[in-house]
């Protein structure tokens, strides 16, 4: 028979994405809103942004939010390689992820997770919590354009919506942790979107891609990059974008090339 003789009783539960957050809630006794998102590379960031809004709306006082991914496998590597999304600089893997460099040729697949504890401000103060940073605004959008090809309108609107939600002007932003995947189309598109969203102030921004050091964590990217951003605000210091050896003239912003920078954020 072509059919399996036995199916595990754990087959269905193990394939439901929100079982992950369910296990966390059971382990720690979390009884507030419990949900899981799956929005590809923005999963972690969407989870954090939506959790912040739940706190803002009064649905809860504390949320644990972020993203994780483990895709370094024959199937994961093969799929992205077939899509020609990965760098082929296999003879020099340490410099293969090079966002905004003229010779970038794709991203490096990474694995990992980034999770933050979000807490209502007065609640955090009352228990003497160490506060690393504050989420003041969140924006998300779609460009209704193409399944994989980038478009400037979607990210532009997302950034402008975050500014509007935060109630601040573009010139009040000092630092931007960008997507910066090291793909030829994506990095140029993101640069143009930043310039459209921030106008003349874009040239004064410090923009960096921590993917130059971690690789692309896919669903975990937004989580770990939110951690990096919070720590950049807390210390205050911009992480570098490493491996910029020959900056692409079409990517003409300040990417904090190769060296971390002390700065007010």
Indicate residue ranges for each PLM-predicted region.
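Acyl-CoA/ACP chain-elongation machinery
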Residues: 61-105, 138-152, 180-187, 204-254
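Condensing-enzyme catalytic core mediating Claisen C-C bond formation in acyl metabolism
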Residues: 91-166, 174-175, 244
